[in-house]
From Swiss-Prot:
It holds the Pfam family MRP-L47. It comes from the Eukaryota. One of its GO terms (cellular component) is mitochondrial large ribosomal subunit. The gene is mrpl4. This is Large ribosomal subunit protein uL29m.
Amino acid sequence: MHRQSIVRLTRQCGGLPLVELPPPYLAPSLHFSLIRSPVQCSSFSSTAVAAGRERDLSKSRGVSAIHRTGPKFRLGVSKYPLPKPVSPDALEKRYPTPDHGLWGFFPKDKSALSTPEYDVAHGRSWSIQELREKSWDDLHSLWWVCVKERNRIATSNLERQRLKAGYGEWEANDRDKVIRVTQKSIKHVLRERWYAWEDAQRLYKNGYRPQDEDNQE
């Protein structure tokens, strides 16, 4: 029997006892409605609350500023006027520093790219025999001169790749190779001095004294 027909029949007869009802497997809704008490339920919504703002019922909701629709809520505005940019004529002129340290990343003429003639005009690398006669301060200064020159070459190569100049890459790389040979020679000389200092320290710990040999003579 259909559920609506059973419910209609129950209302007309003023309610049927459990004996007159059909079996539960035929009409489970009738048995559950008589046994269970009504449960209060509410609708579920995931929409956030409007935070105390009432709906304005505006038909122009979401219309852009092109249609001249003003804000729907009052906005706070500062009473101070907006700052105005200073005229370039009123600004104090600043002159560049001619001896600034960053000019070391550029050629002597302060151009963005070094010319092939400038990069190819270099001498040979320092030899190990020449560097052995230099002091620690001289080697330290020469090392940082090489570092600054390699940074300048790297800056020119990066700018050359950005501009896609198509020239000067071979000359710059050849100059960089000569500088790297000098740096390797400096490391070799410093390594020799380090080993010599270790040997002298080991001999001194073992009891060797140079003045003893002078006294024996």
